[in-house]
């Protein structure tokens, strides 16, 4: 059963991504018609944002890489950290890029031709990715480079939530 209508976009959302970042004087690497990469200055470190457009699915994918190279051998700590981080998310998820030994935030959005405010929607997805990476960077850093127990590393974040109740 296919409930999705067959929409054909009249544009490529990668162009919108390119326009959003170009307007703020960011350097972009347009790898091909459906991919672009941009490096943004973060609070803790630079982040690499990778965008890919999948035409058949009408899906714009965003990966935001945090430049934290893991030095720990115990992968169970890494995956426990990812699970704890993902429990707090409403959209997107954290993953681990094993080839580069670093965490990555991923999110995808379906874009149809008849949608209004596509630029605003894309900007919102970018903001969410950057904010989530900024929020979790210190925690990922102490787990991946110092070997701290993931639950201990998350404790200050849990206290923030309790303090706001």
Label the model's feature ranges.
Residues 7-28:
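Amphipathic alpha-helical segments
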Residues 9-13, 70-78, 121, 125-128, ...:
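Short amphipathic alpha-helical segments
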Residues 23, 80-88, 127, 131-138:
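Short, intrinsically disordered, mixed-charge
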Residues 94-130, 134-147:
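Charged, low-complexity intrinsically disordered regions
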